[in-house]
């Protein structure tokens, strides 16, 4: 038997990966998936040891688009690992972060869609070595969506019922309590929203030359009281993201 680290086959192409942290966020997509033509069921792969953290991949069609719905688990490492593994299974035209996020910028409202086209880590600090706040050493300052991905956002407000705000989302592994939000706002005053996954996903996409965008619904406004209250039911916010992503796919893939 010969040993090789070279991929032995051409990876199938799909329209999109849709990365969600939690089953609650992924469920609207999973409910809407139908089998690919010629298949009898949606193909599902679960990776991870029994009794430990597991990540799932569901391949099917979503309103005519071939997608892989990835349920990664919460946090930067889980999102990065899940998308990196996904890229060994298929080649997407774009990776879309779905689900929920916390609103930061004053004009964003609960239920709005954070159409994030740039992202940076909110808790990375290598400034002592001359890097920008939020920048990982030897990586870009932040990560940006392509012009094609940005252009597809232009019609999204008219294509679905939720208001879309375009800007930057910041990512960290700390829940957005009042203390954490004060630090984030001081360091990243232009940030639209905060989550725990998008930048990890975007870094993997950048490393592999794959496009990405984030279309998360705002479930709460961060800061005072954020550790006690969600201002919109999580399932409802996740459905807002689902509706926005379905509409976006039609705009991006046309």
Feature roles, as predicted:
Residues 174-227:
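A C-terminal functional module that forms or caps the active site or interfaces directly
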Residues 91-96:
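Proline-aspartate-enriched helix->loop->beta-strand connector
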Residues 100, 104-188:
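Mid-sequence, gly/pro-rich, charge-dense loop/helix-turn segments that line enzyme active sites
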Residues 82-90:
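Short, well-structured alpha-helical segments in soluble
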Residues 223-254:
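His/Asp/Glu-rich mid-to-C-terminal helical/loop segments that flank catalytic regions of hydrolases
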Residues 2-81:
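N-terminal short beta-loop-beta anion/metal-coordinating cradle
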Residues 28-30, 80, 106-107, 124-125, ...:
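Short glycine-/acidic-enriched loop or helix-start segments at secondary-structure transitions
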């Amino acid at each position: 038997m010969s040993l090789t680290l070279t991929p032995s086959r051409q990876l199938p192409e799909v329209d999109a990966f849709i990365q969600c942290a939690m089953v609650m966020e992924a469920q609207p997509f999973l409910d809407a998936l139908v089998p690919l033509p010629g298949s009898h069921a949606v193909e599902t792969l679960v990776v991870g040891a029994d009794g430990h953290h597991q990540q799932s991949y569901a391949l099917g069609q979503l309103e005519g688009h071939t997608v892989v719905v990835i349920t990664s688990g919460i946090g930067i490492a889980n999102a990065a690992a899940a998308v990196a593994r996904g890229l060994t299974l298929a080649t997407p035209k774009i990776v879309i972060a779905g689900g929920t996020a916390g609103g930061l910028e004053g004009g964003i409202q609960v239920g709005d869609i954070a159409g994030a086209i740039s992202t940076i880590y909110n808790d990375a600090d290598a400034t002592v070595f001359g890097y920008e706040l939020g920048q990982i050493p030897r990586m870009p300052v932040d990560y940006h969506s392509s012009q094609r991905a940005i252009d597809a956002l232009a019609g999204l407000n008219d294509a679905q019922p939720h208001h879309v705000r375009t800007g930057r989302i910041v990512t960290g592994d700390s829940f957005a309590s009042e203390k954490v939000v004060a630090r984030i706002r001081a360091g990243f005053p232009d940030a639209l929203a905060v989550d725990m996954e998008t930048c990890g996903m975007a870094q993997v996409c950048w490393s592999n030359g794959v496009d990405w965008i984030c279309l998360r619904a705002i479930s709460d406004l961060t800061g005072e009281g954020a550790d006690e209250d969600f201002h919109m039911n999580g399932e409802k916010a996740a459905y807002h993201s689902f509706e926005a992503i379905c509409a976006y796919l039609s705009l991006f893939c046309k």
